[in-house]
Amino acid sequence: MYLYIETLKQRLDAINQLRVDRALAAMGPAFQQVYSLLPTLLHYHHPRMPGYLDGNVPKGICLYTPDETQRHYLNELELYRGMSVQDPPKGELPITGVYTMGSTSSVGQSCSSDLDIWVCHQSWLDSEERQLLQRKCSLLESWAASLGVEVSFFLIDENRFRHNESGSLGGEDCGSTQHILLLDEFYRTAVRLAGKRILWNMVPCDEEEHYDDYVMTLYAQGVLTPNEWLDLGGLSSLSAEEYFGASLWQLYKSIDSPYKAVLKTLLLEAYSWEYPNPRLLAKDIKQRLHDGEIVSFGLDPYCMMLERVTEYLTAIEDFTRLDLVRRCFYLKVCEKLSRERACVGWRRAVLSQLVSEWGWDEARLAMLDNRANWKIDQVREAHNELLDAMMQSYRNLIRFARRNNLSVSASPQDIGVLTRKLYAAFEALPGKVTLVNPQISPDLSEPNLTFIYVPPGRANRSGWYLYNRAPNIESIISHQPLEYNRYLNKLVAWAWFNGLLTSRTRLYIKGNGIVDLPKLQEMVADVSHHFPLRLPAPTPKALYSPCEIRHLAIIVNLEYDPTAAFRNQVVHFDFRKLDVFSFGENQNCLVGSVDLLYRNSWNEVRTLHFNGEQSMIEALKTILGKMHQDAAPPDSVEVFCYSQHLRGLIRTRVQQLVSECIELRLSSTRQETGRFKALRVSGQTWGLFFERLNVSVQKLENAIEFYGAISHNKLHGLSVQVETNHVKLPAVVDGFASEGIIQFFFEETQDENGFNIYILDESNRVEVYHHCEGSKEELVRDVSRFYSSSHDRFTYGSSFINFNLPQFYQIVKVDGREQVIPFRTKSIGNLPPANQDHDTPLLQQYFS
């Protein structure tokens, strides 16, 4: 036994040293400096060293002895700065070990890779000491960033995984209850920089079910010494719920970084395919270590992940996704094999061998190596391919849930956040601008863009066509348009938000008299000035809340301008009665078309078009209907006007009208249900009525009808039906109502006799059920199951995608005031919070 253990320790140390050497060899001097000095900076604490702060900051790493590089650094400090570094006191030190995890030291580590560091500490550190250590780590992150190296520290209590502590998708965590999968990744990718060896590696795979007993036997026999090992626990069996939660989180991460996430997504899918008897990859690597089979290029965790995914996809004969995952792997490794290198490193040698096995030719390598120069056609093809792969994983995940009798509402808040993010990123809707470049190519800019209008009655359908070339007949005739839409606003928005249209792009337009080049250039300048391309990703809180309009542009008279008729005409009007909506003797409306362009709190970009005399009324009703009553006002509201005449007057009047209506919509209360705005358009009077859940429009022919409409709205206020005429919705439900979403609100009754349910459908029609009995959890599960199965809403197809599942809320009282919070099942809601004092937020780097 003793010789066996000693052999294992030697293999462990050899593999660990190999990984350290590989991590350093792949990176530049700044990374090497940070990587080498981090243990020293955590072991010591001195004012002249990075990371210093006042207070009783825990210092000292168990079993740490500075190596030659670290000793040289300390000697330099003593020699040139005249400082004396004191060793921490003897005995059990507070930091049990410092480890990297993730792609560092693997073939997947690239020149742009960041560092994820686990700082494992003793469980006896108190709350204040943990906070001080966390602050020191934050200072070290800033120090590394100043050198151009991205480092993320995670404080890990050595007993954390034994306590089954959990977080949620909304925090700096990896969703609901994913401890075993997190340990799986740590155990297969960890590199010890300093401190104790990892005990789990010493326990044979066939003893995993009796992990603690086997460890105690080793200690009792004196084969191992307890205080020399980091023990985070064994890899026990995984629940179906954990696979489901982990896969949700991985899909969530993959939306923003699809190439980076494909491999991990498919590893989880492979695990679920083998369920209930999966072979965790960490166990596979450990078995190879115990058997002395140092395969896969030194048990490289990234290569072994590819090997497992390849095995799975080959078994299910999914060669399309197998080809995709190989390309993702190649791009992640970032060794351009089509270009000659004087020095052939180990990563290049590994990749060359794999590419040879895959049978790739030079043309494919050149295409992949040219990714930085991919333009819209290649990017759109890649986007569709990644989307198909992601939706296939999503479908398989839901099938796994059904096969194992899991409710998709096991954690309704998590799935709510994920479905909203999928909905925002991928649901194809009329007027929505699809963003096709999620970190696929760095630059889609085009030197030339041409917009061509085809009027009705031609062979091609009427509308606008966009080409990425100058408008000569040969180039246009022989090429397909990049994009088509009936309205110019949508095409300009698509080109701008996808990065094709920049300040350097030459614009051309064949507008058939509708829009000329100066007007197009004005619009492009306005949109680019008021709508930044890069914004922070929406927070989980924003995704779980009803979407709110953040940036709004109202574009007036872009495609149809009534004032163009004023040219060479005498127009009679009274300067004292300059009403642009009912202008001059003929009371003409000077607003002929309105385009809306807005970005919401989910970072969706939407466009809408209205034309004709009623375009202003229709646009107002539509945009106000998208603002729920408790929404924050938009961050910006801009009016762009492109009239030939009276431009300033029209813009000012529209701006005043829109601002006034938004104020009326967002300030309306239940006590003021009769608020309205009268507007005269083309000689006719219209009333905009600001009701609790929406905005209605009514034509008012005469004074009696006008007064009657106002009185009716004052008395009743609601245009929707409830259970009885006497039932009133709670104010918080009114404020949370959001069109396009099915919402369930649970409210405990005052006499504690059951609960009430308020249901708002996509059009904000209301149903109310009083004194319900039974289990809310079962209701949530059944409703979620119905919606996920009846419309196959989790399935991607060419004709229909709908990720927008019903949302569930609980009405609670906090300090005497009613509030709406996400409904959580008891099994989830009673878990400890993710951010207790003794807990570092864990772990954004899992599945990153």
Curated annotation (Swiss-Prot):
UniProt keyword list: ATP-binding, cAMP biosynthesis, Cytoplasm, Lyase, Nucleotide-binding, Phosphoprotein
Protein name: Adenylate cyclase
Biological process terms in GO annotation: cAMP biosynthetic process
A GO term, aspect molecular function: ATP binding
Signal peptide range in chain numbering: none
Top-rank taxon: Bacteria
EC identifiers of the protein: 4.6.1.1
GO cellular component, one term: cytoplasm
Region Regulatory: start-end pairs: 541-848
Keyword field contains Transmembrane: no
Organism, as annotated: Shigella flexneri
Main location as per UniProt: cytoplasm
Region feature Catalytic, mapped onto this chain: 1-535
Family of this protein: Belongs to the adenylyl cyclase class-1 family.
Coiled-coil region(s): none
Gene label: cyaA
Main enzyme class: lyase
Cellular localization per UniProt: Cytoplasm
Phosphohistidine carried by residues: H609
